[in-house]
């Protein structure tokens, strides 16, 4: 939707719009181009968690004890995205499972390359800038959103999607 707020919606694409004072104790109807499809494809899963760099450690701790974890990347318009793959690699590496499929191994390698930096948040930011999603946000004048999304562990919330109600609980 080209990073543009839809008519009739109170919030747009920017995570900076979703401040505590605006969303706390509110019911939010959210639609996305790609994320909604990815979440709906997971409805048969035992548990559906939503991850970002912002809640990285919380999600890693939540999945640590599970024997099998599927990390689903939403992508963009049916394409693999760098930002999704980087986060998937971070989650898979953080989980430290004894067996990984090839997709996980590729994502983990991307994450390991990114981690080779004194300033991990800055390195994540640089990776996100060169991704297609990052380029789209730059064209929309939303570089500050990329910077915000590149910050690790700014939140400890664990969003869970109920497969029955299709409501995300924080």
PLM feature segments, named:
Residues 5-13, 26, 65-72:
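Structured catalytic-domain cores with a bias toward divalent-metal coordination
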Residues 35, 41-78, 83, 87-93:
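Acidic (Asp/Glu) carboxylate-rich active-site/surface patches
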Residues 10-27, 31-33, 41-47, 82-170:
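Long, charged alpha-helical interface segments
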């Amino acid at each position: 939707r080209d990073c543009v707020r839809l008519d009739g919606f109170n919030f747009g694409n920017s995570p900076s719009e979703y401040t505590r004072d605006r969303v706390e104790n509110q019911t939010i109807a959210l639609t996305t181009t790609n994320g909604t499809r990815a979440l709906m494809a997971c409805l048969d899963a035992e548990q559906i968690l939503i991850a970002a760099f912002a809640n990285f450690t919380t999600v890693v701790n939540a999945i640590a004890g599970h024997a099998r974890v599927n990390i689903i990347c939403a992508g963009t318009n049916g394409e693999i995205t760098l930002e999704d793959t980087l986060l998937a690699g971070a989650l898979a590496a953080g989980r430290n499972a004894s067996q990984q499929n090839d997709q996980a191994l590729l994502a983990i390698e991307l994450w390991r390359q990114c981690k080779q930096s004194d300033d991990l948040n800055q390195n994540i930011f640089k990776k996100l800038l060169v991704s297609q999603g990052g380029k789209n946000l730059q064209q929309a004048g939303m570089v500050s959103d990329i910077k915000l999304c590149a910050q690790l562990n700014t939140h400890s919330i664990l969003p869970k999607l109920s497969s029955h109600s299709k409501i995300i609980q924080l």
